[in-house]
Every structure is written in structure tokens, then in C-alpha cells.
A protein has these predicted regions:
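Catalytic active-site module of serine/aspartate enzymes centered on a nucleophile-bearing elbow/loop
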Residues: 120-150
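Alpha/beta-hydrolase-fold enzymes
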Residues: 1-49
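Active-site nucleophile elbow and catalytic-triad environment of alpha/beta-hydrolase enzymes
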Residues: 62-80, 86
Length: 150
């Protein structure tokens, strides 16, 4: 059975050479649709404004190449989470669309040197720069580092 990624792999491989530019997935849209989901609105507010725009940011521009993430598709990134002996802190905004992933990952961790921090009122991008509301819990991060990174 052929991989569902095969068409993208063939379409993107080798492109970017003198024959042409690589195909892209698309970043955050330049014009936000009226019915855009809340997480896309938050990304737009960050990546498409002076708050987070950068000409080389993949989310501010035209996104990743269609083949750049293929190597991660079958990577079991949490398969050995329960074997981590060192301190782990997971920080998510209360309103982050990705919060479920951090909470799921936290449940796999063992030991008493793990901490899950849910920042009240914060969304995903608020934790990039504070979101104008001091959302980054620097005091908690510092305390965790001092306790666990000796």
C-alpha cells in the first residue's frame, strides 16, 4: 500500500533547484476569513501584525514546504515519555487550542519532578511574548529550574 504522503513527496522532492521553487503548505492567511476559528484569529493577531511578523517566519509568509514535515508523521514523540527521569515542565494557556496535547503528554510522565502549568486566560500565542498581559509565568519557570536543574 502506498503511503498517503507519497504524492506530496514526489511533488516537492527536488523542487527548489534551478527548476523552480518548492511547493508550500501556506502560512497564516493574509486576509482573515470572517468565519475563522478562534485559534486562527489568535495566530493572525500574532503572525500578521507587528507583534510577531517576520519576513522569514513560515507562519507569517507562505508556510513550510510540502515535504518538510513528512519525517515527523510516524515519529512516536511520546512513546518514551514515561522514561524521562529529569524535570519536565509543560506550560499551556488555558484557552490554547493545543492545551489537550500538553495535558495528555503530562499524564504519561512519571516522578515528582514534573509540573503542568495552565496559564489562566492565555491562548497559544500569549506564551510567545506575554500577549500584552504578562502571560508568561516567569516566576514559576524560574522556581522549577532552580529546583530541578541542578
Amino acid at each position: 500500500m502506498a503511503s498517503p504522503c507519497a504524492p506530496y513527496s514526489r511533488a516537492g522532492r527536488g523542487v527548489g533547484s534551478p527548476s523552480g521553487a518548492p511547493k508550500r503548505t501556506g502560512g497564516v492567511p493574509d486576509v482573515l476569513p470572517e468565519n475563522a476559528p478562534e485559534f486562527l484569529r489568535r495566530y493572525y493577531d500574532y503572525y500578521k501584525t507587528s507583534r510577531g511578523y517576520h519576513a522569514r517566519s513560515l507562519n507569517s509568509t507562505d508556510g513550510f514546504t510540502v515535504v518538510s514535515r513528512l519525517a515527523l508523521i510516524n515519529t512516536p514523540i511520546l512513546a518514551y515519555a514515561g522514561e524521562i527521569e529529569h524535570g519536565v515542565m509543560i506550560v499551556h494557556g488555558e484557552k490554547a487550542h493545543s492545551r489537550y496535547f500538553g495535558e495528555s503528554a503530562f499524564k504519561l510522565l512519571k516522578g515528582d519532578n514534573k509540573e503542568l502549568v495552565i496559564v489562566p486566560g492565555a491562548d497559544h500565542t500569549d506564551l510567545y511574548d506575554g500577549g500584552g498581559k504578562n502571560a508568561i509565568p516567569f516566576d514559576r519557570i524560574e522556581a522549577f529550574y532552580r529546583k530541578n536543574l541542578k
